[in-house]
UniProtKB/Swiss-Prot annotation:
Name the record gives this protein: Cytochrome b
Membrane topology per record: Multi-pass membrane protein
TM regions (residue ranges): 33-53, 77-98, 113-133, 178-198, 226-246, 288-308, 320-340, 347-367
Lineage: Eukaryota, Metazoa, Chordata, Craniata, Vertebrata
Annotated binding of heme b b566, by residue: H97, H196
Subunit structure: The cytochrome bc1 complex contains 3 respiratory subunits (MT-CYB, CYC1 and UQCRFS1), 2 core proteins (UQCRC1 and UQCRC2) and probably 6 low-molecular weight proteins.
Length: 379
């Protein structure tokens, strides 16, 4: 009799994705981040669900309800710290996952890559609306500043902003709808993840050497299920350490003050994982231009497959392109640093140079160097 996991309509899908999936035998730990992102999503949904049981999305009680969760709910402080720092780990894994894709040419699976960029945008939106919920100073002013960017849209901008606010400023209606969105989006992300996996399993994973691996595949279980399990243990240990020993390390002290529309914080800035995009936004001394640059900083990932000029897939055997990749990593770190700095000399010019370099690397330098490497190989 055939095995149930190979015949049952539902188990067959899980089996083809997690047990009998033919996997390249040489994929490294850089291929662990997909499953780690899945773990992050599950952990965020679970901790978020328990937080939502005690949270109230009303401006008069939101801040107090979060304090109540931390003080009075059994292990509420732990659930909240895991949820807040879990978001940071989510983005760490996201950035490493995208970096892996850029380094090893995974973006040549265009459908998988484009769904991935959409997922990235969805997770960013989820994190943004979630940051507003504790209704601290930085929650309120972050929401005000970022939603205000929509007023740069020609003709309909102001109407659009008031429509999102549900009034003439960030107020009760805004908080209520942001809570609704924050509850909904993770499930949309989970659905999009299924599509992401569906497209990935049409082609199979790429691998570190960038060659066809059909001749050398192994079953996903037990080899990579155990390898993923090791990644899970490492990440959960790191998350627990952060949540228990340094729970407020990555947060903003301003968010311990209840939201006050009458007092603007001296430096309005988003969470650390948005600082690179925020720096690009601030580098352009024009509202619409800044908003377009902000959008482009993420959407530029969509054009990476179109601008691939090299005959080789990954950067494993392309030292010149490797150099550009690591310059991009350094540039992202510089932008992250600048995003958290006040708008004054010399930070303004550093941010502008870093922003120009960011787009140049994607749109000009990488395709150019790929083309040059082809020439050198033929020579």
């Amino acid at each position: 009799m055939a095995n149930l996991r190979k015949t049952h309509p539902l188990l067959k899908i899980a089996n083809d994705a997690l047990v009998d999936l033919p996997t390249p035998s040489n994929i490294s730990a850089w291929w662990n981040f997909g499953s780690l992102l899945g773990l992050c999503l599950i952990s965020q949904i679970l901790t978020g669900l328990f937080l939502a049981m005690h949270y109230t999305s009303d401006i008069s009680t939101a801040f107090s309800s979060v304090a109540h969760i931390c003080r009075d709910v059994n292990y509420g402080w732990l659930i909240r710290n895991l949820h807040a720092n879990g978001a940071s780990f989510f983005f760490i894994c996201l950035y490493l996952h995208i970096a892996r894709g850029l380094y090893y040419g995974s973006y040549l699976y265009k459908e998988t890559w484009n769904i991935g960029v959409v997922l990235f945008l969805l997770v960013m939106m989820t994190a943004f609306v979630g940051y507003v919920l504790p209704w601290g100073q930085m929650s309120f002013w972050g929401a005000t500043v970022i939603t205000n960017l929509l007023s740069a849209v020609p003709y309909v901008g102001n109407s659009l902003v008031q429509w999102i606010w549900g009034g003439f400023s960030v107020d009760n209606a805004t908080l209520t709808r942001f809570f609704a969105f924050h509850f909904l989006f993770p499930f949309v992300v989970a659905g999009a993840t299924m599509i992401h996996l569906l497209f990935l399993h049409e082609t199979g994973s790429s691998n570190p050497v960038g060659l066809n691996s059909d001749a050398d595949k192994v079953p996903f279980h037990p080899y990579f299920s155990y390898k993923d399990l090791l990644g899970f243990i490492i990440m959960l240990t790191a998350l627990t350490m952060l949540a228990l020993f340094y729970p407020n390390l990555l947060g903003d002290p301003d968010n311990f003050t209840p939201a006050n529309p009458m007092v603007t914080p001296p430096h309005i800035k988003p969470e650390w994982y948005f600082l690179f995009a925020y720096a690009i936004l601030r580098s352009i001394p024009n509202k619409l231009g800044g908003v377009l640059a902000l959008l482009s900083s993420i959407l530029v990932l969509m054009v990476v497959p179109i601008l691939h000029t090299s005959k080789q897939r990954g950067l494993t055997f392309r030292p010149a392109s490797q150099l550009l990749f690591w310059i991009l990593v350094a540039d992202m770190l510089v932008l992250t640093w600048i995003g958290g700095m006040p708008v004054e000399h010399p930070y303004i010019i550093i941010g502008q140079v870093a922003s120009v370099l960011y787009f140049s690397l994607f749109l000009v330098l990488n395709p150019l160097v790929g083309w040059l490497e082809n020439k050198v190989m033929n020579w």
